[in-house]
A protein has these predicted regions:
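A short, charge-rich alpha-helical start-of-domain segment used by transcription regulators
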Residues: 1-11, 21-24
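C-terminal flanking helix
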Residues: 6, 10, 31, 96, ...
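Residues within helix-turn-helix
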Residues: 21, 114, 125
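Structural recognition of an alpha-helix C-terminal capping motif at a helix-to-coil junction
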Residues: 25-32, 36, 45-57
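Arg/Lys-rich amphipathic alpha helix in sigma70-family domain 2
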Residues: 40-43, 52-73, 133
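DNA-recognition helix of helix-turn-helix
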Residues: 60, 120-148
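Internal acidic/polar
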Residues: 61, 66-92, 112, 147
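A short pre-motif secondary-structure segment
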Residues: 102-106
């Protein structure tokens, strides 16, 4: 389970935290909790959806304790591999956190709307609207870049 899902969970953690060290800590805690609660896992969703849900809760818990900032650091290289260019990466980084979460899950990790909905514990309609707003904002930013 760890081998198949560590990259996805790490990409998600990096996308929603401001610090690669915090993301690493969140990923470790995610897999510790997953191991602890494995007997309660129901196959109603995929393992990655379940792990992303755990990771999101871990990051929220850590943010309450450590007041994690929303912006991504400049030196995060791992998640850049998922984007076609640094410009697009920077545009995604500027999205509000709720939109960024949906973009990471759907566009990068390949979640369908239902899986993203389960992972983020929000309605499917909210996933769709956040993704639509993110696409609209990214489109505007891309138009601005292309106009230069």
């Amino acid at each position: 389970m760890i081998r198949e899902n560590i990259k996805g969970v790490t990409a998600f953690a990096l996308a929603i935290t401001s610090n690669p060290h915090v993301a690493e800590e969140a990923v470790q805690e995610t897999f510790i909790r997953a191991w602890r609660y494995w007997p309660t896992f129901r196959n109603e969703s995929s393992a990655i959806s379940w792990l992303v849900t755990i990771c999101r809760r871990v990051v929220i818990d850590m943010a309450k304790k450590q007041k994690v900032h929303e912006q991504l650091p400049e030196n995060v290289i791992e998640i850049r591999d998922h984007f076609a260019s640094t410009a697009i990466y920077d545009m995604v980084r500027e999205l509000p956190l709720p939109q960024r979460e949906v973009v990471v899950l759907c566009a990068i990790l390949g979640f369908d709307y239902e899986s993203a909905s389960q992972a983020l514990e929000i309605p499917i309609g909210t996933v769709r609207s956040r993704l639509a707003r993110a696409r609209e904002q990214l489109g505007k930013q891309l138009d601005d870049v292309m106009a230069i």
